[in-house]
Amino acid sequence: TRLQVEHPVTEFITGLDLVREQILIAEGKPLSFTQEELKIHGHAIELRVTAEDPTNNFLPDIGKLITYRRPQGHGIRVDDGYEEGMDIPIYYDPLLSKLIVHAATRELACKKMIRAIDDYKISGVATTLPFGKYVMQHHAFLSGQFDTKFIETYFTPDQLKSENVEEEKIAALMAIKVLEENGTATIATHAVNEERSKWKINRL
């Protein structure tokens, strides 16, 4: 029997290794636990990270993973098959990874997911990470009062675009600061302030 996409959530809250149990069954052995022994511990949330652009109707994106750094820490798990430098082609499903977090309560799990998203560094292709963070911070999701029409009801691309612009402004200011410290402030300031600058606001 195949595993469900959300099996890491089950593994986090039960402490079981479902793949190991499958292998035991394939070998003709019994499960290593009984129904009575199953206990649920805490809350887990899974986010499907895809190479799709949430600011452009979630259209699939292609390109090279220029940056690919997974978040680390207790209660954080990343199931993936990609490494930095690999190509995201047009031929397959745009799924990059599954990001799963576990904490004592749902509220803490949401906070941990936000931190994990912030620590998950991907550049070269657009991803659904910003949308995932938007959901984790939204009052409807936090309260549990939502349904499958969440995007239709609450989400507009502009909500992410404004955040991306602010992040890029901060990145540009940090770059100027580094250049100033290296003695190239004049060149950097001129490039940023120039009306016909070659800089384009795009994904990093």
Task: Give residue spans per PLM region.
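Catalytic cores of soluble metabolic enzymes centered on carboxylation/carboxyl-transfer
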Residues: 4-204
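A short beta-strand motif that forms the metal-chelation/ATP-contact edge
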Residues: 1
